[in-house]
Amino acid sequence: GVSVTDIDGNLASSQITVNNGTLSVSLAGGATISAGANGSSTMTISGSEAQINTALASIVYQSNADFNGADVFTIVSTDSAGTPLSDIDTVGITVNPVNDPPVNTLPGAQTVDEDTPLNFVGVSVNDIDGNLASTQLSVNNGTLNVTLTGGTTITAGSNGSGTLTLSGTQTDINATLASLVYQGDLNFNGSDVLTMISADSAGTPLSDTDTVSITVNP
């Protein structure tokens, strides 16, 4: 655990800091935060030695979202002598990477007239780990068409059908998604839904499913 001892009994404060995350402590023991803030990357805990140690015993570190790599926990404890003295120590923290699912972006609800093509704007996908594998698009009462860009291929379904699966790099898939066109079935009017499922290529693949409603006016 993390603790501090002052043999003279005049401990005043302990400052704790990390570079790539946040720190939280419990103040139930009576310590106060005199600088920084709970749930931030740095704070200074003040109180008696017992109060400070109670707070230090409750430290929780949370890395920043999607961060992995090396971080450093630094503690600087200072006494209240006429000429204050301090002690500085550090602990290395290794944050291992974990797979994150891809994230789809879709526009809001769409409206189009019967027998009129609808050009989708704002359809994209992002995988922060860079291992996007595929994006499946489907509708119930119409067809979808895309212009294949770069090395993107259709690995299931087909252009001009109600469902198709795009495979390729994230850049190429997004360039292809920018060309997405919906066409309702002949003489169809009513409600339809575009469903988008993007999956990554991790050992245990993760996916994101999103939908956008389409109203086809008569």
PLM features: what roles do these ranges have?
Residues 1-218:
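Extracellular glycosylation-rich, acidic/polar low-complexity regions of adhesion-
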